[in-house]
Amino acid sequence: MRLPAQLLGLLMLWIPGSSADIVMTQTPLSLSVTPGQPASISCKSSQSLLHSDGKTYLYWYLQKPGQPPQLLIYEVSNRFSGVPDRFSGSGSGTDFTLKISRVEAEDVGVYYCMQSIQLP
């Protein structure tokens, strides 16, 4: 007779609370830049992305037209292999920035910031 109560306890343990969901907000939503000029995109998280292991799980992706998203920056400021050094990431806690020192025509696309400290 104890099984139903134990099962209910397990189910309750796995119900996510909506108040704990992390919301990511990027600004600006659209940006027009002349080639050769710098560009900056901000990303704000509703909660700190600093993990107990000391790492901050914030990533930047670029999706070029007709292509899947490609990783640019991982853990706030580390450039992924092959990413040009004109791309840089910075920030901590809840506030992050992606900077492009000199925009090139090939940089056109949709930029996303993503967290992985909390997964669905």
Swiss-Prot record:
<dbReference type="Pfam" id="PF07686">
    <property type="entry name" value="V-set"/>
</dbReference>
<feature type="domain" description="Ig-like">
    <location>
        <begin position="21"/>
        <end position="120"/>
    </location>
</feature>
<keyword id="KW-0393">Immunoglobulin domain</keyword>
<keyword id="KW-1064">Adaptive immunity</keyword>
<comment type="subunit">
    <text>Immunoglobulins are composed of two identical heavy chains and two identical light chains; disulfide-linked.</text>
</comment>
<protein>
    <recommendedName>
        <fullName>Immunoglobulin kappa variable 2D-29</fullName>
    </recommendedName>
</protein>
<feature type="signal peptide">
    <location>
        <begin position="1"/>
        <end position="20"/>
    </location>
</feature>
<dbReference type="GO" id="GO:0006955">
    <property type="term" value="P:immune response"/>
</dbReference>
<dbReference type="InterPro" id="IPR007110">
    <property type="entry name" value="Ig-like_dom"/>
</dbReference>
<dbReference type="GO" id="GO:0005886">
    <property type="term" value="C:plasma membrane"/>
</dbReference>
<feature type="region of interest" description="Framework-2">
    <location>
        <begin position="60"/>
        <end position="74"/>
    </location>
</feature>
<feature type="region of interest" description="Framework-3">
    <location>
        <begin position="82"/>
        <end position="113"/>
    </location>
</feature>
<keyword id="KW-1015">Disulfide bond</keyword>
<keyword id="KW-0391">Immunity</keyword>
<dbReference type="GO" id="GO:0005576">
    <property type="term" value="C:extracellular region"/>
</dbReference>
<keyword id="KW-0472">Membrane</keyword>
<feature type="region of interest" description="Complementarity-determining-2">
    <location>
        <begin position="75"/>
        <end position="81"/>
    </location>
</feature>
<feature type="disulfide bond">
    <location>
        <begin position="43"/>
        <end position="113"/>
    </location>
</feature>
<comment type="function">
    <text>V region of the variable domain of immunoglobulin light chains that participates in the antigen recognition. Immunoglobulins, also known as antibodies, are membrane-bound or secreted glycoproteins produced by B lymphocytes. In the recognition phase of humoral immunity, the membrane-bound immunoglobulins serve as receptors which, upon binding of a specific antigen, trigger the clonal expansion and differentiation of B lymphocytes into immunoglobulins-secreting plasma cells.</text>
</comment>
<dbReference type="InterPro" id="IPR050150">
    <property type="entry name" value="IgV_Light_Chain"/>
</dbReference>
<dbReference type="GO" id="GO:0002250">
    <property type="term" value="P:adaptive immune response"/>
</dbReference>
<dbReference type="InterPro" id="IPR036179">
    <property type="entry name" value="Ig-like_dom_sf"/>
</dbReference>
<dbReference type="InterPro" id="IPR013783">
    <property type="entry name" value="Ig-like_fold"/>
</dbReference>
<feature type="region of interest" description="Complementarity-determining-3">
    <location>
        <begin position="114"/>
        <end position="120"/>
    </location>
</feature>
<feature type="region of interest" description="Framework-1">
    <location>
        <begin position="21"/>
        <end position="43"/>
    </location>
</feature>
<dbReference type="InterPro" id="IPR013106">
    <property type="entry name" value="Ig_V-set"/>
</dbReference>
<keyword id="KW-0964">Secreted</keyword>
<keyword id="KW-1280">Immunoglobulin</keyword>
<dbReference type="InterPro" id="IPR003599">
    <property type="entry name" value="Ig_sub"/>
</dbReference>
<feature type="region of interest" description="Complementarity-determining-1">
    <location>
        <begin position="44"/>
        <end position="59"/>
    </location>
</feature>
<keyword id="KW-0732">Signal</keyword>
<dbReference type="GO" id="GO:0019814">
    <property type="term" value="C:immunoglobulin complex"/>
</dbReference>
<keyword id="KW-1003">Cell membrane</keyword>
